[in-house]
Amino acid sequence: MPVYRIRGVDVDFPYDAYDCQITYMDRVLESLQQGKNALLESPTGTGKTLCLLCSALAWRRTFGEFLRGGGGGGGGGGGGGGGGSQQPPYGSQPSGSQHSGGSASQSSRYPVIIYASRTHSQLRQVIKELKATSYRPKMAVLGSREQMCIHEEVSKLRGRQQNNACHYLCKKRWCRHHNSVAEFMRNNSELGSEACDIEDLVNIGRTKGPCPYYISRELSKSVDILFAPYNYLIDPGNRRSLNGIPWDNAVLIFDEAHNLESICADAASFDLLPNNLSSCIAEAQECIQLCSAKRTFENSADKQFDPENYAILKALLMALEKKISEVVIDSKELGHTKPGNYIYEFLSELNITSETSKKLIDTIDGASLLLEEGNSAETGPGMKAKATVCRLETIRDILDIIFRGGGQSHAKYYRFHVNECQQNSGDALKVLGKVSRTLSWWCFNPGLAMEEFLKLGVRSIILTSGTLSPLDSLALELNLEFPVRLENPHVIASDQIWVGVVPVGPSGHPLNSSYRTRETLKYKQELGITIVNFARIVPDGLLVFFPSYSMMDKCINCWKDRNHENSSDEHTIWQRICKHKQPVIEPRQSSNFPNAIEDYAAKLRDSSTTGAIFFAVCRGKVSEGLDFADRAGRAVIVTGMPFATPTDPKVRLKRDYLDKLGSASNKNSKALTGEEWYVQQAARAVNQAVGRVIRHRHDYGAIIYCDERFVWQNYQSQMSYWLRPYIKCYKKYGEVVQGLTRFFRDKVSIDSSKPNETDFNDNIVLLADKHKPQETISALAVTTANENQRTALSVNPTTKRSNYIKFAQITPANRSTLSMKHGCSSTSQLLYSGDKLSTDAQVIDLAADVATSHLAGYRFKSLGPKKAKVMVGSKDVCFDDGSPKLQHNVESRALAGCLGEQSTASSKKSNITHAPGNSGAIHEKSGGQESNAGPAFLKLAREKLSTAEYRDFVEYMKALKLKTMHIKDSLDAIAKLFSSPERLPLLEGFRVFVPKNHLSLYEQLVQSYTVPNT
């Protein structure tokens, strides 16, 4: 296993690392060593999770060996540390630490790594990656009771019902699983020393008996690394429940952090819905009755069961309901808005202040226990646990948010808002004649949640994702300094991706999904016909993302409506789409989503069809976290920018808040405007959607932006950094069809590792080994057989030289694993020989793509508006219906006859043959047959050119015939292709095929490539 020394730390990595992976680990170590926050963007497939784990754990090991046996272990040794440059252990214990037993003094000396991701399934993948490394830290993974409860009855419940039932049974010691945790932990002190996920803990519970949920809580008190979902850390209530975690000097890593700011803002906000408030009033009344009954039957004088307390609580809630209903709302669209600190004035009229809120919270806590006991009065050790929900806990959470820390300074980041709710016809409140209103207190500074971590004394906060861009706005939103930043390139070659902006459809009508045009019939039809053609060109799986569910429904309904068809075609647009791909539509209801995924998988497996098409929405479930690798996602179409509804009160107030904040800030300080935030939120959703395809090193696919607004530089600058070099804006739809068809024709022809079946596991499509670098370059990435050409792993010209110099300073600590026989030459420039780096060996250039770089910058002309077909390869590709027609002898005719009367070959009647004894020389023989000239020249070209170069040459010839490429660009490309010394016979011999009126131009090009510069 290779070991890389980066910033003085020896990092064990399970495979030979790509240069971009070394760069990533370098930034992680910079953040950890210097105690700075970091924003790290690296595309999916570049192994960021593996890099995070290896670099962070290598840094942690410099403080001492990993914990063993309930926190015991190495005792401050070197543990594979990095020598004198390593940091010393901390000299003092964290003030907020809570450790148990003898492990406290030792483990508190070392920083704990807390690794958070959005979902349990994502954490499962992270732990799987940990198992692939050589690191074996003491670890724990936190999960909810829904994932971990094994009690026969409680496991069937959900949410607060499950939590309350669990609390009650544990309090009564009626849960045998909870009762056996302490003894199990004493007898299994090594638990956590090997990587184990939630499923492993559940299996232990089912076979051995102890509760997996409480095992994980015990393990979390003394660990090297802790895995947890976002909400466990960001939500104040959940964070309070994590007793024993040493926050001081801890490292927080947020993976998949592209939505972190919205999660933070939502955690600090609340919406008090009218039905929730009514339920709270009903629960307060129930508490009164329970207390009265308890006093009567038990003759108890316990103040905790004083019904007067709950009568006061009920009266307060009813007064709050009445006060909300009396708020004057002038406009249903705008609602009633006040500055954030108005909430204190509003509540003070009900005698709810910072002081009285503490008593209210105590009363609500008592009510929660009372309701648990009351609803479980008949429950015994062998009886079912009853489901209970304490809505009053919602009021408790609201009071915590409003009176956090006992101060009011945070209110300046909020807006107070009251608005009328949409009512159903059977709404109980409407029947009672009450006004149905929602009281909201919205936080517009996501940085408040991050501030809490700083107060806890964390050392570094690392945010990473494949789609963090734009980084500046994210840093401004979170109100944190992020001195360490990275926008990594991808590890794929440039011929593995096609990115195009399609501004118009087949008829030339603009594609623009803005509110001005998206409702028009012409736009919907043009978009539909555009998708029909892409459904035919793209093999296997195709994803189509709409800005919203509403827009998706309207377009699909339009395509299905035969009355909207204004052509002679007997089929609707929807039927024509289904002719090429079997459709699946993302459901609005989350409960139906697994069925949609299974349906898509089944249709992909169906060998009688040409694939499936998944219609989905940006910010929906398809766009978040699913892995459409290989056949599951060969292309993604984005039909427009998913802007939030501008009239939505929360969106409108957020924009207004940012604009006012910017106008009040110092002119020298950077501030985010409301408009910038509005655009960037949409752009980030698009970036997340397009990230569903091209999921690993050998994957390939196309990204198609079907909206003319993506041509704008303002929009392109918001796209992920790694994607920008590949973007090409087309003017004509024919150019798009030509380029896309050629891309997939070339990829399919060399794809020798096509999966035979589709595997959907844990809602992840076509699972691929995302991080394991390959020793050799896949056939998907190789475009030439020329041994002198280097195959690129990414295109990033601006960083080529700087990366080479930087990586030359990083020496591999494990030299033997990086020798030539171990394949290092195929991954990086870290070739070690003695005490010096060797750069003589063959290396892969990470910054240039020689195989296709000569195509960049050429301008393609459009076909005429009346031309219904474009020539691509050896096929006629129609824009719409009709089977492709093979053309015989295309290559020969491209030379011998395609230029017609303009060719000098037709006037000279000459042919080209090889001169005996002079390999490669070309002579003209007057009086020869013109028909022999083309095949003879092609034969020589095949001998002199690589496979990819020969293919490019034929394409240039077709461009000359069809006039789809400017003549100067075509001739320049051909002359450049023939310019090497061994190909000069081709350069000279091609003269006979140049049109007469461009012969002088070709002569100039020949001279420029053959006359040496002086």
Curated annotation (Swiss-Prot):
Positions of [4Fe-4S] cluster binding: C149, C170, C175, C211
Domain Helicase ATP-binding: 7-308
Motif DEAH box: chain residues: 255-258
GO molecular function: 4 iron, 4 sulfur cluster binding; ATP binding; ATP hydrolysis activity; DNA binding; DNA helicase activity; DNA polymerase binding; metal ion binding
Biased composition annotated in UniProt, kind: Gly residues: 70-85
Main location, first listed in the record: nucleus
This enzyme's EC code(s): 5.6.2.-
Keyword set, alphabetical order: 4Fe-4S, ATP-binding, DNA damage, DNA repair, DNA replication, DNA-binding, Helicase, Hydrolase, Iron, Iron-sulfur, Isomerase, Metal-binding, Nucleotide-binding, Nucleus
Compositionally skewed regions (Low complexity) per UniProt: 86-106
Entries under SUPFAM superfamilies matching the protein: P-loop containing nucleoside triphosphate hydrolases (SSF52540)
Stretches the record annotates as Disordered: 70-106, 906-930
Pfam families found in the cross-reference section: ARCH_RTEL1 (PF23109), DEAD_2 (PF06733), Helicase_C_2 (PF13307)
Claim: DNA damage is one of the keywords in the record: yes
Catalysed conversion reaction: ATP + H2O = ADP + phosphate + H(+)
GO cellular component: nucleus
Localization (cell): Nucleus
InterPro entries, per database record: ATP-dep_Helicase_C (IPR006555), DinG/Rad3-like (IPR045028), Helic_SF1/SF2_ATP-bd_DinG/Rad3 (IPR014013), Helicase-like_DEXD_c2 (IPR006554), Helicase_ATP-bd (IPR014001), HHD_RTEL1 (IPR049909), P-loop_NTPase (IPR027417), RAD3-like_helicase_DEAD (IPR010614)
UniProt: ATP binding residues: S42, P43, T44, G45, T46, G47, K48, T49
Any single GO BP term: telomeric loop disassembly
Homology family: Belongs to the helicase family. RAD3/XPD subfamily.
NCBIfam families reported for this sequence: rad3
Function of the protein: A probable ATP-dependent DNA helicase implicated in DNA replication, DNA repair and the maintenance of genomic stability. Acts as an anti-recombinase to counteract toxic recombination and limit crossover during meiosis. Regulates meiotic recombination and crossover homeostasis by physically dissociating strand invasion events and thereby promotes noncrossover repair by meiotic synthesis dependent strand annealing (SDSA) as well as disassembly of D loop recombination intermediates.
Name of the protein described by the UniProt record: Regulator of telomere elongation helicase 1 homolog
Source organism per UniProt: Oryza sativa subsp. japonica (Rice)
